[in-house]
Every structure is written in structure tokens, then in C-alpha cells.
Amino acid sequence: LEGLIQEAYPDFAEVLRRFGSPPIRSTATLAGNIANGSPIGDSMPCLMALGATLVLRRGDKTRSVALDQFYTGQKQNVLQAGEFIEAIELPKPVAGQVFRAHKVSKRFEQDISATCAAISYSLKGGKLSGVKLAYNGLAPAPCRAPKLEAVLEGQAPADVKAADLDAAIAASFTARDGLRATWAYRSLVARNLVLEFIEEQKEVA
């Protein structure tokens, strides 16, 4: 799996390499990570930013659910009794698409996240377009960040202001400290990762 993802989305592959030890990675599955629904699950922000869809099966019936609509709360999801995740559908990369992701943790490997952020976008006329941004560690479940996406959409990378991102973070998430990091740290990192993700596009724009 890492090899397939490496070619298309190197940042996602890096997140996967930092997920647990090799024995864990060789037996674990993405579907299991998703179904477990940890608020700090590492694969989900990447998959959400890439527009992943889940195929759910119960008996001979299947249905498709966007991953960013899968969770209803902490460790809660839309799976019905007897239903399981049969497949994860991921769109192929398109020309001009930018995907960035980064996990922040105390240790580089084999550690749970303070937060993990992932973003997908393209540049059209020098402005950010089709922005999808997702996090873990900021809410009861991994999630998209539509208020932050709105701040970014249609803006030139150089025009994005830290203060606007801070306001969107405050409006999107309930402040709470955790064992791995304070809210002040998480919210600062959440903002700075976005700025880092678009920084390299300023010269292009």
C-alpha cells in the first residue's frame, strides 16, 4: 500500500510510514483505522482531503458514503448493524493537484498524533481552488474544516492571513487540552501547517 501511495501522494505515504511499527502496519488495515474512529486516527485526514468514499456492505446490499460524512461523533459513525467497510475509493491524482500532509507528534515514529493535517488544492489563475482541508486531534472525530477551506478558496497564497485562519479555527472547533498537547499548541500548529502547505505556491502564483 505504501508503495502505491508513494508515487501518487508522497506526503500520505510518509504519514503511513510513521503509523506504528512494521509488524503493526503489516497486519493493520485502513478500513480498520477508519472504523475504529479514533479522534487522532492518522489516515483519515489524508483520505478526507483526497475526497475518499467508503463502500459499505451488509449482505448483498452496498452503499457509498463520503468519508467526511462517516463520523457522527466520538467513536460514532453511520455503520448500521451488520454493515462493514468493504472498500475505500480514492480518486486518481489530476494534473495540477497539490496534496500536502504532516503529522505532529512527540516522537517521529510509533507515537500518537498531537494533530495531523492534510490539504488538497490546485491553483487556477494564481488562486487556490478546490480546497479540501482535514485534521485529526481538533474535534471528537477526524473531520474536514469547511470554515478554513472558505478562508483559502479563491485567495492567492500570498494573500492568506494568519489572523483569518486563527478566527476560522476558533469558530470551527471547541478548545480543549489533551494528554498529548494543549489546545493553544494544537490550534497554533493547525494554522501554521496550512501556511506551510501553501507557502511553496507563492512564487508559482
State the predicted function of each range.
Residues L1-A205:
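C-terminal structural segment of proteins
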